[in-house]
Amino acid sequence: DILAAFRVTPQPGVPPEEAGAAVAAESSTGTWTTVWTDGLTSLDRYKGRCYHIDAVPGEENQYICYVAYPLDLFEEGSVTNMFTSIVGNVSGFKALRALRLEDLRIPPAYVKTFQGPPHGIQVERDKLNKYGRPLLGCTIKPKLGLSAKNYGRAVYECLRGGLDFTKDDENVNSQPFMRWRDRFLFCAEALYKAQAETGEIKGHYLNATAGNCDEMIKRAVFARELGVPIVMHDYLTGGFTANTTLSNYCRDNGLLLHIHRAMHAVIDRQKNHGMHFRVLAKALRMSGGDHIHSGTVVGKLEGGRNITLGFVDLLRDDFIEKDRTRGIYFTQDWVSLPGVLPVASGGIHVWHMPALVEIFGDDSVLQFGGGTLGHPWGNAPGAVANRVVLEACVQARNEGRDLAREGXDIXREATKWSPELAAACEVWKEITFTFEEVDKLDY
C-alpha cells in the first residue's frame, strides 16, 4: 500500500475518527452517498483505510491521520495520477477546517514503475569530472531585463572566476527583452569560452520551461544541439506530466536536468494546510530531476535544519529510516532509484560557506546569486571569493577541523591569500536573515 500521513483539522463537532474516515473515502472510492454501482465492484479491495490517528502535541484540534491506499488505485509511473487521487479533491472538504499531507510512504513495487532522475549523483560527477566537494553555482541577476548578450557576459565572468554552474532564474523563459534562442546561443558561447580558459567542465542551467510540452522539448533539443550539459525546468508551475516528459528526453540524450521549485511555498508553507515539501521532494525524485532547490537553513528562505536535512536525505539516500525528529513519518526504501542533488540557494554569501558545507556535505550544489554578482569588484571576483572559501572549508574539514565552531576563523584565514575573498567578507559581514520559522516540528 501507499501510506499517507495527513494533518487533519476537523470542523468543530466533527470527531477525528469521522474526519479521518472521510479523508480516506474521498481520496479513494467513496462519495457523499451510497450508490447502486458500489455493488458492481469489490470496494474492500480498492477503498482507502484510515488505520491510525494521533493527536498533535500542543494543538487543540489537530490530528495526524494515517491512511493506506491499495496500489491498484494508481497508474504505474504517474506522479500526476498519484496526486490526483490522494490530494486532488479532499482538501476542499467542508467537514475539515484544514488538511495537510505531511508525508507519503511509496512502496518498492510502485517505486519500480518510475525511472526517476535522468542520471543521478554519481553519473553527474563523472560527466563533470568533479569529486570531493560541493558544486558551486550562481543565479544570474537581475533576473529579468538583461539583453541576451549582457546575460551571456555575466555567465562567462562567473564561470571563468571558478564556478561550476550558472543558472537562469525560474521566471526567465522567452520574454520580449531576451528570447530563448538568443539566450541559449550567448550562454553556450560563454560556457565554451570559460571552459577553454579554465580547463574545467562548466554548465549553465538553460530554462526549457515553456507554455506547452512541444515548445519545452524544442528548447531542450536546441540545448542538446549546442552541446551544453544541462537544462532546467520549473516542475511545479510546469506540471508533473511535463516534468516527466522532459526527464525522459534528458535521460535519452545525455542532458542533466536542474529542477526549480517555483510556487512550492504556495503549497507547503502553511503548517496546517496544503502539502509538505518532503512530499513534493519525493514526487520529484520519482518524476525525474538531477538537482532540486531545497532551501539553505541559513539563508533568506524558510526551512529549519532538522526538517531540511530530513528531505535532503530523502532526495539523496537509498534507504531512510522513520525519524519524527526530522519530520520523516515513514521508512522509505528507494530500491536503488538514482539520487537527486539538493541545491542550497537564496540569500547566502561567503560567511555562510562553512555552515553550508557542514550541513549539506559534498553531494550538494551551493548557489550564490547576489553573493557572487554583488561583489564590489565585479562578477568574476565574486566567483573567485566563493571558490576560495569553499576550497578552504573543504580542506579544513578534511583536516578534521570543526566547521560549525571554527567556520569564521577558517574564512578569515583564507582572506590572507585572496583579496577577492577579503573584499566579500567585508561587504557581507553583517548580513543575516533571522526570522522565526513558520513550519516547526511537533516532536
Curated annotation (Swiss-Prot):
Signal peptide boundaries: none
GO cellular component, one term: chloroplast
Keywords: Calvin cycle, Carbon dioxide fixation, Chloroplast, Disulfide bond, Lyase, Magnesium, Metal-binding, Monooxygenase, Oxidoreductase, Photorespiration, Photosynthesis, Plastid
SUPFAM superfamilies documented for this protein: RuBisCo, C-terminal domain, RuBisCO, large subunit, small (N-terminal) domain
Entries under Gene3D superfamilies matching the protein: Ribulose bisphosphate carboxylase, large subunit, C-terminal domain (3.20.20.110), RuBisCO large subunit, N-terminal domain (3.30.70.150)
Cofactor(s), names only, from the UniProt record: Mg(2+)
Modified residues (N6-carboxylysine): K167
PROSITE patterns tied to this protein: RUBISCO_LARGE
UniProt entry tagged with the keyword Glycosyltransferase: no
Binding site for Mg(2+): K167, D169, E170
Post-translational modification: The disulfide bond which can form in the large chain dimeric partners within the hexadecamer appears to be associated with oxidative stress and protein turnover.
Cofactor note: Binds 1 Mg(2+) ion per subunit.
Catalytic activity line of the entry: 2 (2R)-3-phosphoglycerate + 2 H(+) = D-ribulose 1,5-bisphosphate + CO2 + H2O; D-ribulose 1,5-bisphosphate + O2 = 2-phosphoglycolate + (2R)-3-phosphoglycerate + 2 H(+)
Entry-linked Pfam families: RuBisCO_large, RuBisCO_large_N
Active site: K141, H260
Remaining remarks: The basic functional RuBisCO is composed of a large chain homodimer in a 'head-to-tail' conformation. In form I RuBisCO this homodimer is arranged in a barrel-like tetramer with the small subunits forming a tetrameric 'cap' on each end of the 'barrel'.
Described purpose of this protein according to its UniProt entry: RuBisCO catalyzes two reactions: the carboxylation of D-ribulose 1,5-bisphosphate, the primary event in carbon dioxide fixation, as well as the oxidative fragmentation of the pentose substrate in the photorespiration process. Both reactions occur simultaneously and in competition at the same active site.
Quaternary structure note: Heterohexadecamer of 8 large chains and 8 small chains; disulfide-linked. The disulfide link is formed within the large subunit homodimers.
Protein name: Ribulose bisphosphate carboxylase large chain
The organism of origin for this protein: Borago officinalis
